[in-house]
């Protein structure tokens, strides 16, 4: 058992059961099992369930990173980027390669694809750069290509997403209105706020909407886009973001309390 550092200075007690000589293993956070304990389920039964899940999600014997992880030429196709808050992660950022972006930081991780592994990844540290003899410029170059390919962006009207999730055909599509809001994420909804960085995505969206728009950092996993038809002001939207972040979003998933603005003519996202 160990204490696992999470985003935004959060931490959680976790269990990692790694096979001898292994390089990667699933992580189980004990907070996820606390409701079971509160329901009266014994610690022995919870432990058995963790062992069962660990067995189900262990990488197959044929999967190994032992050699690849030390060779950047073999790892470069796995490098992706994500966005995190800059100020809330200053301590972490001193240990990892990053690029400042607005009030955020672009950081890098290796996305591992293997049977039985869900969202397998590891954060790239400064020590990895030294071992690989590469620079942050190398990471951003490869991450730009890989992230778009491995995690294609997803752009949907919020009402359409609600209908999709509710699976309720009685909820008919609404006509376009100035009050419409849109979700920008990736197809896995996993650190999907990074879709803001994808080449040409914001310019294509602005052309589709035919106007400037606000970007609300809903969480590290997605953003909400609000067309600027004069219905909302930036202070109003910022107040909304602060309220939602403080009451509805887990601390480790908060991206920012600031609202961004995309200018169609300048093709620029700014604070």
Cite the ranges covered by each PLM segment.
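Extended, low-complexity regulatory regions
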Residues: 12-17
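A contiguous, surface-oriented mixed alpha/beta subdomain in the mid-to-C-terminal portion of proteins
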Residues: 92-241, 245-248
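Sequence-structural signature of the catalytic-core scaffold of metal-dependent phosphohydrolases
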Residues: 10, 21-30, 36
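Long, mid-chain structured domain cores
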Residues: 29-124
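A short beta-turn/loop motif at secondary-structure boundaries
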Residues: 6-9, 217-219
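Short acidic-glycine loop/turn motifs at beta-strand connectors
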Residues: 20-21, 227-230, 262-266
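Helix-rich interaction surfaces within compact, conserved domain-sized segments
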Residues: 243-262, 267-268
